[in-house]
Amino acid sequence: MRKIIFVFAFILLLSGCSNAPEATPQEAAKAFNGDFTAEARTVFGDSEAEITIAKNSMSISIFVTYPAELEGMGIEIFDEHAKISYDGMEQEIKTDSLPEGTPFLLLEKLFDELSDPEDFTLSTENGNLLAKGEDFSAVLSAEDFSLISAKFPAYETEFAFSEFLFSGGK
């Protein structure tokens, strides 16, 4: 009888039973409703770029740091318009005039959907969280919800995030 109890306890131990609460979309959305900064590498089609990102309650700012010929190009996205800057020039445009699969707009869509718990599901995978929306899947840190990566298969676009920092924490 002792062996059976020991084997059962050992199986429970190996199966990872814990009392840790599961992360919810509401908790993740709360984090993404705040301000944050990040660095990311994006691959879209046959191209790639490195960017810096800053999100606040008013806008999302994205600046290209690589490739060298686009370094310094930036876009600040507001609700329905954007301000594009490059080499001392600025132009305001409506966001709906940008091509649908533009990495800038995909990031805006990602952050917008991760800010609304009704727009994505959340599950655990390999010690991280997997958020799935209509057009994307994203891997989040289980510790603080920071983005690790995101994929938009329909647009052949991927983002790998580094230095992702929420201003107010989790």
Report residues per predicted region.
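Sec-dependent bacterial lipoprotein signal peptides
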Residues: M1-G16
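N-terminal leader/targeting segments and the immediate start of mature chains
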Residues: L13-M58, E69, D96, S167-K170
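Flexible, processing/modification-adjacent segments and terminal tails
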Residues: E27-F32, T37-T42, I84-F136
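Hydrophobic/aromatic beta-strand elements that line small-molecule binding cavities or substrate pockets
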Residues: A49-A54, I75, S137-L140, E163
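An acidic-aromatic
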Residues: T52-K109, A154-E158
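Gly/Pro-enriched, hydrophobic low-complexity segments
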Residues: S61-Y66, S115-K170
